[in-house]
A protein has these predicted regions:
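Acidic/polar, glycine-enriched structural segments that form the non-catalytic walls/loops
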Residues: 1-45, 137-139, 148-153, 210-212, ...
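Composition- and surface-driven signal marking solvent-exposed, interaction-prone regions
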Residues: 77-80, 212, 218-222, 298-299, ...
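Aromatic-rich carbohydrate-recognition surfaces in CAZymes
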Residues: 45-80, 84-170, 193-196, 200, ...
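Catalytic cores of carbohydrate-active enzymes
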Residues: 3-8, 20-25, 94, 156-167, ...
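Active-site acid/base region of carbohydrate-active enzymes
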Residues: 2-15, 71, 78-92, 131-193, ...
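Carbohydrate-binding/catalytic loop surfaces
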Residues: 25-45, 94-118, 163-188, 242-280, ...
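Aromatic (Trp/Tyr) and acidic
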Residues: 183-190, 197, 254-308, 334, ...
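Short hydrophobic/aromatic segments of transmembrane alpha-helices and their interfaces
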Residues: 37-38, 123, 144, 182, ...
Length: 421
């Protein structure tokens, strides 16, 4: 049965992957990728930040499987270049672009005090992945200073001085829409383990790009910044008691040396752990900055059926959390427990990275079973699913990171999978 679903999914993804590509239109001067097929209820016309990055991971696998290297390069590179075209002088990059405009909530630019979220830190990662695949950085070389401004904007305007951790400005367009560690929380109060894991890899990716063009001093500087961030994550986000990484609460009142109250013993901590069991707690394994001992403890947590381990993958929120909720929703999409292709894939990649092949195989097979059953029954895939019975919950026709099961299938069959940076 599993082999039949593998073949079914391979054929479907290889045939339909080109439906995620779009030609230049309006303000988008370059070809680009979108999350859904034409005509899908959502996401069929817009270029999104981490969605386009994940689409490129899939398209690399399609090109490898069909022996057509570079087939989608113009769309993948164009996605990066479109974002760079719309980067302002301060390095602020939009989260989303359409031919007619972009998704905004408040002003993320200097005029707004850099107080809104911007493109997630996957821009250098996207470029580094495509550069490695192409064997040349010539396509991105002129834009490297722009990527540098983008990263510097994160470091200058989105990082907490006391901890060295990146934080969400608001809960707007954070990717994991209603993650309770950020959703409806005060502005600039959450040092997200998800955001910091992405930023750690972003700094490493930019270092790789700089090395590729021969700028070794700056490459070393960016890698040192990545190491500093990893130290901050291990210091402030790791919980030795629970054996996992959590996001941190930064919303502490400042110490006032002029106020006599508490002067004898003011607080000496810079943050408090937000002990909310969320799938993104496993992202430090994907990022490769967890120690071997930390990874082993997290592996045990990923195996626990009371919390994360479900019949069809990793619950996006532990079943023991009071916020656990499997109802269908859009704006926000629901990350309060449903299984997503993206979370299954990134947890799988973390398990592979630390040599936990049996656990990785089990998660990959669950994902094949989830998507194979849906494709066989409905002729399409959906955005997210019930973790225990595998029933689709929302958005028929969603493609994007669901197609990452193709990369899992390659790994299951002992082929070298296409991977992210």
């Amino acid at each position: 049965m599993l082999e039949r679903w593998e073949r079914l999914l391979e054929q479907h993804i290889r045939t339909n992957s080109e439906l995620m590509t779009r030609e230049p239109a309006g303000q988008l001067a370059h070809p680009y990728t979108v999350p859904s097929a034409p005509g899908a209820a959502h996401y069929s016309t817009a270029l999104w930040d981490w969605d386009s990055w994940s689409a490129s991971i899939v398209l690399g696998q399609v090109a490898a499987d069909t022996d057509r290297p570079g087939e989608f390069a113009v769309y993948e590179q164009g996605s990066v270049l479109n974002f760079l075209d719309h980067t302002d002088d301060d390095g602020v990059v939009p989260i989303q672009l359409t031919p007619d405009g972009s998704l905004t909530h408040s002003d993320p630019s200097r005029a707004g005090g850099f107080s809104e979220n911007m493109h997630k830190p996957v821009l250098a990662q996207h470029a580094a992945m495509l550069t490695k695949r192409a064997g040349s950085a010539d396509w991105i070389r002129p834009s490297l200073p722009t990527i540098g401004r983008f990263i510097d904007r994160y470091l200058e305007s989105h990082v907490h001085a006391g901890t060295g951790l990146a934080y969400w400005q608001t809960d707007f367009a954070i990717g994991v829409d209603n993650d309770p560690s950020a959703f409806y929380r005060p502005a600039q109060s959450t040092a997200s383990v998800y955001l910091n894991s992405l930023l750690y890899r972003e700094l490493q990716a930019y270092g790789s790009l700089l090395e590729e063009v021969g700028d070794l001093p700056q490459a070393g500087r960016r890698r040192n910044q990545a190491a500093d961030l990893a130290d901050a994550m291990r210091t402030h986000l790791w919980d030795e008691r629970d054996g996992t990484f959590y996001s941190a609460d930064l919303a502490l009142r400042p110490v006032d040396d002029e106020d006599w109250l508490h002067r004898g013993a003011p607080r000496r901590w810079q943050s408090l752990l937000l002990r909310i069991d969320n799938w993104s707690s496993f992202l430090p394994m994907w990022a490769g900055m967890a120690t071997a001992e930390q990874a082993e403890r997290m592996r045990q947590r990923a195996r626990d059926p009371r919390t994360f381990a479900a019949a069809y993958g990793i619950r996006s929120l532990s079943r023991l959390e009071k916020m656990y909720d499997l109802r269908a929703s859009n704006n926000p999409s629901n990350w309060l427990g449903p299984v997503w292709g993206m979370s299954n894939y990134l947890v799988f990649r973390g398990l592979v990275k630390y040599g936990f092949d049996d656990d990785a195989r089990g998660l990959a097979e669950k994902t094949v079973r989830l998507f194979g059953r849906d494709l066989e029954a409905s002729g399409a895939l959906h955005e997210y699913y019930h973790p225990d019975n595998g029933e689709p919950i929302m958005t028929k026709g969603f493609q994007n990171w669901n197609f990452l099961v193709l990369n899992m299938i390659a790994w299951l069959n002992q082929r070298v999978p296409a991977t992210e940076f």
